[in-house]
């Protein structure tokens, strides 16, 4: 079982199995990545990532890992 916890402070669910909708999700086995920024033009990002805040210049510095 995943050792990291996922309190889901912003709602959603994270079973550390296949869902990740928590801002503070640290589940290493979560199939979806928690990205700070998911550009709309990035289909893979929109499909496999859960965006959690960050807009403008701040988001630009934190490129979504799914797009790299």
Swiss-Prot record:
GO terms for molecular function: cadmium ion binding; copper ion binding; metal ion binding; metal ion sequestering activity; protein kinase activator activity; zinc ion binding. The modification Phosphoserine is found at residue 33. It comes from the Eukaryota. Brain. Residues 1-30 are annotated as: Beta. A divalent metal cation 5 binds at residues 35, 37-38, 51. InterPro entries: Metalthion_dom_sf, Metalthion_dom_sf_vert, Metalthion_vert, Metalthion_vert_metal_BS. Belongs to the metallothionein superfamily. Type 1 family. This is Metallothionein-3. The lineage of its organism: Eukaryota, Metazoa, Chordata, Craniata, Vertebrata.
